[in-house]
Amino acid sequence: MPNFRMTLSYDGTRYNGWQRQGNTPDTIQGRLEAVLSDLLAQPVEVAGSGRTDAGVHARMQTASFRAKTALSAPELLRQLRARLPGDIGVLTLEETAPRFHARLSCRGKTYVYRVWNSETPNVFERRYVYALPQPLDTAAMQRAAALLCGTHDYTSFCANRRMKKSAVRTVNAITVERLGEEVRLTFSGDGFLYHMVRILTGTLLEVGLGQRDADTMPAILAAHDRSAAGPTAPARGLILWETRYAHTHPEVGEEKRE
């Protein structure tokens, strides 16, 4: 059966995250599967590179699915674009290697968190930024961010207290930059735990507000305790920016990280 790979972007504001929930179409995965199943007259299951939470957006999510169809990939792309709502956009669609799987083949992700750091409201971007008018010390935030990079057990930055799998992840880089009145945090790594990027962001914002010292980051990591870290930043400021794959797709074997 042909295997298809697609990249898409979406505004997550009105969706209950990526993952399907029963028969509701109010998830990105649920909406894609409903449209594809209707278009191709067969049940279609769509796999994503990971599960974005309710209210989180994506600039470049990668998904894959298998389906029997006489439609070419360009025609399937055209038909899919015509049927999806305006807040879900398919950027590319192609037939791919039989063993490619959007989640299992994924080798890394980049997330961006946007903070509107101004007393002046940003009306047209309000669904895509976290408005925080208090001044932020971005230099202190960057010092703290550097201490959070590397390969660590990130239990303190995970909202799933019952997680039985390893919480060890590799975070390659965290950058904090000011772009006018916006403070942008960028996180790149091999995978992230449940709410991990938002908890990292909330902790770094506490540093920026002077509520926590940058040098306490190693102690938070060592605590292996969610209560040691800062709050979970709101979903609306988070964007799945990029997903990364090997040029040649490896054999699918072990379960990959979110």
Give each language-model segment a name:
Residues 1-258:
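Structured-RNA-binding interfaces characteristic of tRNA pseudouridine synthases
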